[in-house]
């Protein structure tokens, strides 16, 4: 018997059908080993990780050991990325495999699977080292920084090497929006009647460069703009006709697939990845964790065949798209495995995502869309306020659909600016021609703040900043929302009070919050995978940096809200009657403070009477609570010093005869 070990049990049925008799397919169900849960699991100077079987891994490994007794050969067919390579290495270690055959395939089809069996290889230890470095770096930041973060804030909070920079982006965008000051400015639009078509076209006043500067592009004089809108006639200065092309977007990478699923289907990155995982396991799409925006060369023939069948024109030569900076391009873009299949998947999300993937992948090799473009420059026949004013009209008409015959545009964009551009049907004009203005309009404009991030646009930002990798985006989104650092309202992301507290506590104190540092770490991991850097050097550098920052912080930093009694951080605690602040040193320190606008307030001074305690001489306090469970008695203000004396109330005075 030949044993093939894969990651996901969802692939077993499909692979069993492909491989047939003589094969046993078993799943590791992800990682079987990890760093220990209750300790760091790695330490200087060698930073060698200490792994232990996960609770699920113990059962998986026991089952696999039994299967090994019947196996003649073992094929490790975990996923074709760094994570999959690491899982294969851990399986080799746990099962004590002396000569496992490592095979990978980018799609679960008979051709791809059988081709991989013909050319097995050994485990790529450089890629394993890169994954191990990522895991250890995440552990270092989490275990070294989180306790200090909790000390500073008085709350049990966690810091993350990638999640914290993601939260920072959301926090800074929110503050940018709140700090934004609206600028009211003005423009003018002229409208012209086209006698031949009975239509209307428009031209906008050009305020640059005569009326505004590059560093302050807003025209503020409303009266002058209104006068421009009253222009009655213009002279044509120039008229130009040209043709513009619009190329199709590339096929999906992991991040663009998540963005398109969010924008077009309304599903979050995690749901998109879950649907893609199922489609991959069912054999409908290629491997969906990739940053390569190009289809495989072998797919071109299939794309051309489907395009001809659909009556679509293909591009003159195969298209190649530029990969993002730092992309690993280890696997082709996300595409269908059987291009002629129009519908695939078991659920509505899977079917909708498959359709997006297929049409986008076909469109990438279709001909450009073409537009007829007309541009006319106009000048007012008479100066306005002694100044010559010019206008420009630009119109675009689709004359050849090309790839737009198949898909409407780039589904990753929240708003497709190209499609918003008006056709503006400008007639043929001759330089020197005088045109009458049908009507004018004063444009009252105002600047807009940047939009809040959505999960789609945050993924796009993370990718552009080089933060994270295809396999991590969905987990980042899920973590920052599920842990309460970011919340979603009508698809937009807002920081929570906790998220802002984390960012304020870490920024300026730890370098891993800087986007540039996070990007450098990703590049270091890439170099480890390529054999250009060593694991130990990368880990030691980050470890030393964190140690230095923690030492500096512990010497200089004080808690944001220190206890006035012991100096430990105060914590904001929900109570029956709202929030209050208590000392994190409880029960050793039981000081509390009222909550005032999310911050510790001042305790009201204790109101004492002129009556003295007969036991210790301290002033008495009149303690009254009305309603259910109420009370009315006198107590000693020396309670904390040990005097427990109480007195019954007698007509608003302590009854010294009834002392307890």
Curated annotation (Swiss-Prot):
Entry protein name: DNA topoisomerase I, plasmid
Hey, which family's this protein in?
Belongs to the type IA topoisomerase family.
**Where in the chain is the site Interaction with DNA?**
31, 134-135, 138, 143, 289, 483
Q: Which organism encodes this protein? A: Xylella fastidiosa (strain 9a5c)
Lineage at the top is:
Bacteria, Pseudomonadati, Pseudomonadota, Gammaproteobacteria, Lysobacterales
Q: Which domain of life is it from?
A: Bacteria
Question: Which PROSITE patterns does the entry link to?
Answer: TOPO_IA_1 (PS00396), TOPO_IA_2 (PS52039), TOPRIM (PS50880)
**SMART domains under this entry?**
TOP1Ac, TOP1Bc, TOPRIM
Task: Kindly state the subunit structure of this protein.
Answer: Monomer.
User: What reaction does this catalyse?
Assistant: ATP-independent breakage of single-stranded DNA, followed by passage and rejoining
Which residue stretches belong to region Interaction with DNA? 158-163
Record EC number = 5.6.2.1
Tell me the keywords, alphabetical order.
Answer: DNA-binding, Isomerase, Magnesium, Metal-binding, Plasmid, Repeat, Topoisomerase, Zinc, Zinc-finger
Q: Example GO biological process term?
A: DNA topological change
Ranges where the Toprim domain occurs: 1-110
Q: Where are the zinc fingers (C4-type)?
A: 563-589, 613-643
What are the residue boundaries of the Topo IA-type catalytic domain, all occurrences included? Answer: 124-550
